[in-house]
Amino acid sequence: MRKMIAIIHYEYKMQFKKLATWGVFLVVTVFTLLDNYPSASNLARLEFLNEPAYFVYRTMSLNGFVLMFGLMFLLSERFPLDNKTGMKLLLMSHALQKKQYILGKLLGGFLYTFSILCIFLAFNTAVYFVVAPFPIPLLECTVPLVKAIIVSAFPVSLFVSLCSVALPGMIDIRLFYLFAAILFGINAAYVGSANAAPFYMITSGDLTRFIWVNPKWSFNDTESILANGAFLMGSGLVFGGLLFLRHRFWRSE
């Protein structure tokens, strides 16, 4: 257990201190504020921008998607980089079990992704609360933020981190990038509507309807919400689990 925690700590700390992480964070945050800043022009352009819940919803579904796309590239190199630098051989020379190594990588990647996404949502919501040219009760910002973290950020982080870390450990990383580009491309092309969203939406699926729902739409399709959650969490756990079954991955195989 101690060795697995050491790997989790290393993965989390190493990724968190990367300049690339904060470069991605900064770029996406700037674009988020340009797009959603409660200025007169943006308030006129976005009908519901005066609602904190809509701001959190939009930040999570649109800008959070771009953030996840950037973090995907940083996460995808974890196993290939260990092979390339010889770190995996070094770790295998110690009394470290396969499951400790894999779990450490996966959990470290998840905690890193979830932390960055939570910081992103909290920071942008705080800016919105401070600069909005109209009074906002603190609870009106806090409640949708907590909802976004629990019902959206958690399953999204689980899906993106486990898939991005695990799949390049099983297949050629270029093939992973191809699959990821197709999925992210389909997600980027989707335009929301009153109808149920496809279950494979990453940040703009029906789980986000817990955060905010367009008052002009009536939506009661709980099945699509469950399908979206099952896809995100189920896919992440399945792909993460498959890595444990891969043969010739560890010294004893």
Task: Locate each region found by the language model.
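Transmembrane alpha-helix boundary/hinge residues in polytopic small-molecule transporters
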Residues: 86-87, 161-162, 178
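C-terminal halves and exits of single transmembrane alpha-helices
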Residues: 99-117, 188-200
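Short helix-to-coil transition segments within interhelical loops
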Residues: 90-98
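Juxtamembrane/interfacial segments around transmembrane helices
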Residues: 69-81, 117-118, 153-168, 195-212, ...
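Secretory targeting signals
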Residues: 21-77, 103-175
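Aromatic- and glycine-rich beta-strand/loop motifs that create alpha-glucan
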Residues: 1-28, 252
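Terminal transmembrane helical anchor/hairpin motif
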Residues: 38-54, 175-253
